[in-house]
Amino acid sequence: LQKLLKDMVDNDIKYVVMEVSSHALELDRVYGLHFIIGIFTNLSEEHLDFHKTMDNYLNAKAKLFAQSDYALINGDDIYAPKLLKMISVKHATFGLDNDVNLTATDVRVNASYVEFKMYVNKMLETVRVNIPGRFTVYNSLVAIGAASMLNVQMDAILLALANVKVPGRSEVIDVGKTFTVMVDYAHNPSSLEAILSSVKKHAKGRIICVFGCGGDRDKIKRPIMGEISGRLADFTVITTDNPRNE
């Protein structure tokens, strides 16, 4: 990691957006790094093969903010109140349901995009992102918040969001048939429920969910994900997903 960051500096790269895993925090893989902004999106049952309990998992996540100047916290997550008591850095919250600093109004979610309004620097902005799902609104809110704090111009932020494509996230695959095929990385209970809930609102026919869980990893989440798919999909296919040594 340090070598990679050094190469970036040598090539005049000014900013890095990096996912910092709970494993990396717990094992001090990012020890010595200082972050301008630390972001907490959510916490759900995952990696309990490593952390053992959700409290341990949260404690690992909280370490990020001891290395950050500022925190952006999803105020709608059930662990947000506890996390906010654990951190001492300046922070702001984002969300849709609770009393937060960054929120969206007039939210429209359809089968191909989301659109909403939000105030940024006292200006009402209309945001559109071509990734369907309510979770996209959350991701967009925190992206706008972080970019604005780094003095990125709002016009540039809106243009970037309007054109963003994330391979493997609500990605529609054209198979030349009358049905829709969508690929999503959903690999834990919360993300699987989010994508299936979004699809269920717009599907005109049956929903067939094909998913698996990685081998030699958290086994606790497997039946939970099975229940979610069984509840939200019309038919579920369980398949292998990198079985490793299982």
Please place each PLM-identified region on the residue numbering.
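Conserved phosphate/oxyanion-binding catalytic-loop motifs
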Residues: 184
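Conserved nucleotide-sensing/catalytic segment adjacent to the nucleotide-binding pocket
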Residues: 1-21
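Glycine/threonine-rich flexible loop motifs
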Residues: 27, 49-55, 218-221
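Active-site beta-alpha connecting loops in nucleotide-dependent enzymes
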Residues: 166, 190, 197-246
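Short, ordered loop/turn segments at secondary-structure junctions
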Residues: 22, 43, 96, 214, ...
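Conserved helix/coil segment N-terminal to the catalytic DExD/H
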Residues: 23-31
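Acidic, Mg2+-coordinating active-site environments of NTP-dependent enzymes
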Residues: 11-13, 17, 35-181, 204
